[in-house]
Amino acid sequence: MRMAESNKLKTGIFSGSFNPVHIGHLALANYLCEYEELDEVWFMVSPQNPLKAGTELWPDDLRLRLVELATEEYPRFRSSDFEFHLPRPSYSVHTLEKLHETYPERDFYLIIGSDNWARFDRWYQSERIIKENRILIYPRPGFPVNENGLPETVRLVHSPTFEISSTFIRQALDEKKDVRYFLHPKVWEYIREYIRQSITDN
């Protein structure tokens, strides 16, 4: 296990498709910075997996641009395309290993939902991830976590639950609903313009 060092920056790795990023993502990361004393949270956009058919992922560059817009005003947020430059498919264990190697001045904390923790044993080299990294679990409805049974490197955070999903946002947009208050204002405006431009081009 890599022991945390007080002189290193505590950096949360919030990895996801962000398809698209919404206020639930931002509010959770805000909570982790302010209440769990993370110095920064990196929104690490997961690339499209060419081996995974049938996904509804928006283009990589669009999802990354929306994360950039959503995070640029808060100094402790950072957008990241780190996984775009790794061999695919990119497993979390390899991403974390490369992060430690590239940024030795930082301590990294993997941020996952309790729904993912419930099936964490299916992750590639999950035991190694637990052994070599710190993990922060945030609550998700329907997936309680027994804090007493957690490994030393894993901790449950008591953040508010945000029952907003990217799937809901996409469906609402398909139905031409006005969901501006579910998104950062810059993200909302960019998506509106993107849709308008797509209609014009077609």
From Swiss-Prot:
Gene3D superfamilies: HUPs. The keyword Nucleotidyltransferase applies. Pathway: Cofactor biosynthesis; NAD(+) biosynthesis; deamido-NAD(+) from nicotinate D-ribonucleotide: step 1/1. It comes from the Bacteria. CDD domains: NMNAT. Catalyzes the reversible adenylation of nicotinate mononucleotide (NaMN) to nicotinic acid adenine dinucleotide (NaAD). This is Probable nicotinate-nucleotide adenylyltransferase. It comes from Bacteroides thetaiotaomicron (strain ATCC 29148 / DSM 2079 / JCM 5827 / CCUG 10774 / NCTC 10582 / VPI-5482 / E50).
